[in-house]
Amino acid sequence: MEQMGVYSTIHHPSNDRLEVVRERIKDIELEEVQNLEDAWLALDSGDLDLVLAPANLVWNDRIKLASMQFDVVAALTRNHPHHVLVSEDGLEHFPAGGIVLCDEPLIHRQIRRRRNKIDIRKFDTMEIEPTTAEGLRTAQNLIQSGEINGFVTHRGAYDAAGLNGRRHALHNDPEARGLPRFVPTPFCDLIVIIARQGYPGHTLSDWTDEHAFNSWIVQRTVMHRTPAELHEFVGIHYRQQQIGSILTEAERVNDLFILDNLIDPEGDVDDQPRYEIIVELLSKDGLRTTSIERIGPISRLSVDIQFMMNDWNSILERFMTEADGFIQP
């Protein structure tokens, strides 16, 4: 029987996610691991055959994993690939100077873009540790006492900490046309499976998700092709849908970009499932944005993402070299 190490954080609760698919996992024994360094050593020695871990941490260890000849071979279904604002009111109803706690540089800029007069602070200014359930509950108590107006956390962390305050999704909402959007941080809500090179990832298909694995491939590619000093300021949205669902949504909100991409001049539409990718960078004050978007058949994803990144690099080169270029850390 194979052994799989499972590593969880409050933002990416891998154990909780596994409960949904546990009945479909065959011939694999699960073992909770306390830190990733030990997990990599166990995978290298053969004590483990697989490791399940948050994709953002796997990305951070990418150089080490490449040197150890490990590969990401599959991913779990994403539930809520976005952050939430825990607050009694949405951003549109915040008072001028309202206080929000947020440790994500990208979301800091996105909030500035939506409401420039909000006071955005880091959690440590209130001596709060946002990676623990206790810390998040303390932040919720500060809302109730009126010391702050809200705070930003992962949707998964909201559930894991047992929070019950009102929450507002910070995502790319098609219904909110005309309002600045929230493109997710890289690898948000993405949990992946790592194995030694050569492992047959297709044998895990009964309980893993191709959509999520494609999301890993796309986000990894975007990050590889984006200068490292900009990584914490880039937002990446990826989803795939059947053509009927995409058209229904686009027609409801009158999204001409999507409709023009999917319907040919004769009014015909093929029935291939489509991917949607949005990559975005914001200026420090959140007032200027550069982005690139693509929609296409999933069958062309591996080719299209490379052409898209060529265009993305051309955009970045222009804005990083101009005298008034605004894409700065």
Show where each model-derived region lies.
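Short beta-strand->loop
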Residues: 5-11, 97-104
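A short alpha->loop->secondary-structure connector
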Residues: 67-73, 93-94, 114-124
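Flexible hinge/capping segments at coil-to-helix
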Residues: 83-100
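Short, polar loop motifs at secondary-structure junctions
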Residues: 55-58, 103-108
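Small-molecule-sensing regulatory modules
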Residues: 1-46, 109, 113-329
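Short beta-strand-centered segments that line the small-molecule binding cleft or hinge
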Residues: 39-84
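Structural motif
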Residues: 52, 101, 152-154
